[in-house]
UniProtKB/Swiss-Prot annotation:
It holds the Pfam family Phage_tube. It comes from Serratia phage KSP20 (Serratia marcescens bacteriophage KSP20). Forms the virus tail tube. The lineage of its organism: Viruses, Duplodnaviria, Heunggongvirae, Uroviricota, Caudoviricetes. This is Major tail tube protein. Its main location: virion. It is found in: Virion. InterPro entries: Tail_tube. GO terms for cellular component: virus tail, tube.
Amino acid sequence: MAIPKKLRLFTLYVDGTNHIGKIPSVTLPKVTRKTEDYQGGGMQGAVAVDLGLDGGALDASMVVGGVVEELILKYGGDIDEMRLRFVGEIYSGGTSSLMEVEMRGRITEIDPGEAKQGDDTNHTYAIKNTYYKLSVDDKALLEIDLLNFIYKRDGKNLYPDRIVSALGLGG
């Protein structure tokens, strides 16, 4: 029986700066599709028609131990100003793999939590991303770039070139 690979170690880079030891947890994007049920005449049931990504599909958050001024100063920046790179070791039964999640976006919320003398002080940052890329052992599994009309799965862009070109989108 194979044991699933579990996250053993991680760090988060923000604009190239490693924040190892400062960030106890990161909530990575819950990538979700927006669908609408459609049932035409003669169909036994409804099918989910894919309408792209849900609003908030690339949202992330991080919990930061204490006050980190450079992160506070990034609040409310340009739409894709901040670059984040989550790097983690996923491990199972003597086998390690490297998992990376690259994101671009901006901080939209800073929650300093409760201030209580003598207690741990964590700040939670909400991040709205425009770019997301998930890789395992340098293999890109999923890449989404909202500003450049890219939606790749296993390296293949799923948007047809002729549609992208006709709409005047993409790079």
